[in-house]
Amino acid sequence: MKTFANANARDLQHAVNLVQQTHQDGRAASFAGGGSDLLALVKERIVAPDVVVNLKTIKGLDQVTATAGGVTIGGLITLDSLGRHPVIRRQYAVLAEAAETVATPQIRNVGTLAGNVCQRPWCWYFRNGFPCLKNGGNTCFSAAGENQFHAIFGGGPSHIVHPSDTAVALVALDARFRVVGPGGERVVPAADFFILPQQDARRENVLGPEEALAEIQVPPARPGMRSTYHKILDREAWTHAVVSAAVVLEMDGQVCRNARLVLGGVAPIPWRLPAVERMLAGQQITESLAARAAGAALEGAKPLAKNAYKVPLTKGVIRRTLLALAARA
């Protein structure tokens, strides 16, 4: 592993300036919050920063602030703290549940929300240094290779899946991300933060090389809102989602007024299902409707040679999650 220098940031603008100055000096730099994904990338020689800018020294970016306008969540909050926070658990169960499914207790005690949202793919070709599209090459080896856990939606030319659990929940909650960079601040809707390989096969989100995700803004919980996160793994030990679903329903008695459904583990971005959402609006969620919604959700799926099993698995996840959430008091 290449050695690197550590630089402690006083605030976000200082952190941005440190990275910018390092780049101007012709050297590589990376931001680090919890650092768990960055350390893995450095050890695997995917990235080789000369300077790592430590964001943990910035005060106040690990808090949850609730107001009438919703909640603001600092990007440096640990996943453990996020999952246990009473406001998040009470009003935004889908986010608390997603945070609780990430990795292991040890990693959740260190890993941050911003880091989980911005983590790089875990495709074995990318992580093992193959000259693939993500590593600057011109081939996606998974297209004709080992693709059991790759995309069935939105793939091509790269077929990675986005690994973040919390990102799926945040898109379902219609969150917004405050980003800080050399040009100042900007706010990006969560649904627009992630980018498909067709847009840029080297990147997974809109962050520039000198930008950092500062905080997450979640709108207020609406009347009758209930939510949940359902994650399917291929083994009992910790791993990333084979398929996951974040579902947010606004219920009026037995009738669904509004719905947001987002899938994880099946696409290069959190994959929203607007056609299914329209099917559910104004309807009572019955066994029949849930089954039809699940079928509609998989229209347009394009599985690869070894991951067609994800199609029926995803249908089952959607159907079961809808029925369980609609029945919840």
Identify the function of each model-found stretch.
Residues M1-A329:
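C-terminal structural segment of proteins
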